[in-house]
């Protein structure tokens, strides 16, 4: 491999890891300082990612939305750099495509927070649709040529969570601004399954993208 290619791939690795950190760390910080409209603390069991990115009620909403947008774009750059390298194969390109499309969907959710209404609903719905689509590309690459086979598990789990949210009959209502507050007020249930499922989706997508970055690095 040429020296320039090595430098490019090393930079792509660092950009990808930085992108993942921008997706992971902001929700933890924002949840820590969050106070809802009813004065309640944040719970990953009852509050959604959309609420954490709501500008009027979340103190660090700009960190959440900026992290998703710029983190998603950083991952797009990372996967694209690997796909365009001289040693790419059809299998590695398939792996990169899944990462690029999924990262773009994540970036769109950060660009359009819940305060913008319909655009946020469209962005989240696109994420729910693209997750199983990207999982097909990813699983094809893993099962065809890139062991170990258990690497498909986070993608399959993410696809399952995304489909559950996509097929929920109340999906459009749940993606509306202040829907949870109007539904529960200050008395939220111990577990609100749409919120928990949404965070499981975020968790599995994060593991999936991290593992995809590792696989792409190994193949180069």
Predicted feature locations:
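Interfacial helix-start motif at the membrane-water boundary
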Residues: 50-73
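Terminal transmembrane helical module of multi-pass membrane proteins
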Residues: 138-220
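C-terminal TM-helix exit segments that contain a strictly Trp-centered aromatic cap at the helix terminus
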Residues: 25-35, 108-113, 160-175
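Membrane-proximal helix-loop-helix units in multi-pass membrane proteins
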Residues: 99-149
């Amino acid at each position: 491999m040429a020296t320039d290619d090595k430098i490019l791939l090393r930079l792509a690795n660092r950009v990808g890891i930085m992108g993942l950190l921008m997706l992971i760390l902001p929700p933890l910080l924002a949840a820590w300082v969050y106070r809802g409209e009813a004065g309640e603390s944040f719970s990953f069991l009852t509050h959604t990612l959309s609420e954490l990115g709501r500008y009027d009620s979340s103190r660090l909403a700009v960190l959440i939305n900026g992290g998703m947008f710029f983190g998603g774009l950083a991952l797009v750059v990372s996967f694209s750099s690997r796909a365009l390298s001289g040693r790419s194969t059809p299998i590695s390109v398939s792996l990169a495509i899944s990462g690029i499309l999924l990262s773009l969907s994540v970036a769109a959710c950060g660009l359009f927070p819940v305060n913008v209404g319909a655009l946020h609903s469209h962005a989240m719905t696109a994420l729910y649709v693209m997750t199983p689509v990207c999982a097909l590309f990813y699983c094809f690459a893993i099962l065809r040529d890139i062991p170990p086979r258990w690497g498909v598990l986070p993608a399959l789990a993410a696809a399952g969570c995304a489909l559950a949210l996509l097929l929920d009959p109340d999906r459009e209502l749940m993606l509306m601004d202040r829907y949870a507050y109007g539904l529960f007020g200050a008395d939220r249930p111990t577990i609100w399954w749409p919120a928990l499922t949404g965070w499981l989706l975020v968790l599995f997508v994060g593991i999936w993208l991290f593992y995809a970055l590792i696989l792409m690095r190994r193949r180069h």
